[in-house]
Amino acid sequence: MAKKATTAKTKTEKSIEAQLWDAANKLRGNIEAPEYKHVVLSLIFLKYAGVRFEKQHAKLVEQYGDNKILVESPMAYAKDNVFYLPEECRWDYIMANAKSSDIAQKIDKALAGIEAKNKALEGALPSNYYSSIGIDSAKLGSLIDIVNNMEQHMTDDDDFFGRVYEYCLSNFALQEGKGKGEYYTPKSIVNLITEMIEPYKGKVYDPACGSGGMFV
């Protein structure tokens, strides 16, 4: 009896995380994994921050109408743990300029602008990184398109960005080799430690949290 086509598709179909990784990796060119990881992860952050901002922005517009003072108040975003993004730091702006020759500089300015408006991120984001590594603007634009298409695979109850971020971290750790993936702790070890210490109450202090994946 012939096998069902749906079964074969299930076995061969790649996850969206794997598809994104493969597509992004093809655009890497001569950039080494330790460098390229910042390119990919920063774009994922910008997309994530942009999605969260737009949802909060729409909520505020519905509540306050065209009152820009209230709609554009950083505090109105911070109270719900959303980063406030100036116009030139928003994902729509990045997408609109994705094919421009100075897109690297625009991304650097976006990251700097987000830090300036959100003190909790001070020193956490790459500074003038895209401009310094000399990545081809056409390849960077294509990578932005890939990251932009992530949104169509999201659902309201799914931590999609968390899964993609963790997937990329694990793959970069593998590419960098032994001793160079210190920032990433395998999920199996994270689960084991969490089950052992049962951190379900109070506060957790970790002065060497790295990417923060264990907290997530």
Question: Where do the protein language model's features map onto the residues?
Answer:
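Conserved class I S-adenosyl-L-methionine
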Residues: 201-208
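Conserved SAM-binding loop of SAM-dependent methyltransferases across substrates and taxa
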Residues: 211-216
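Non-catalytic, mostly N-terminal accessory regions of nucleic-acid modification and defense proteins
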Residues: 1-200
